[in-house]
Amino acid sequence: MSLERVLKTLEGFGLSRIDAEVYVYLAKKGPKKGRELANALQVTKQQLYPSLKNLKNKGIVTANLERPALFSAVDFEKVLELLIEIKVEQAKVIKETKKELLGSWQSIS
């Protein structure tokens, strides 16, 4: 699988392009500090840190408690499972919304 295909797949699961690039870089290169990541990915720290926060909130990236923090990627297979689980939950919500909308539709005179 090519890098571009991996990035596009992660985007399809709801990650932004920068989130996908940050995750893949950490997964392939190992734990890095924010400054190292920003330099390697040629992004500003102002672009990087919201992405890292988003990835941490999704359970895709972890950070230690040191200063400066060292960021690590969660195993790719586990990330795929997490992202698939999110999509399955979203599909359930959509199905429930469909039922509610159909009920509302039928009650409209």
Model segments located where?
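Amphipathic alpha-helical dimerization/coiled-coil segments
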Residues: 81-109
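Residues within the DNA-recognition helix of helix-turn-helix
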Residues: 51
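Alpha-helical DNA-recognition elements
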Residues: 54-57
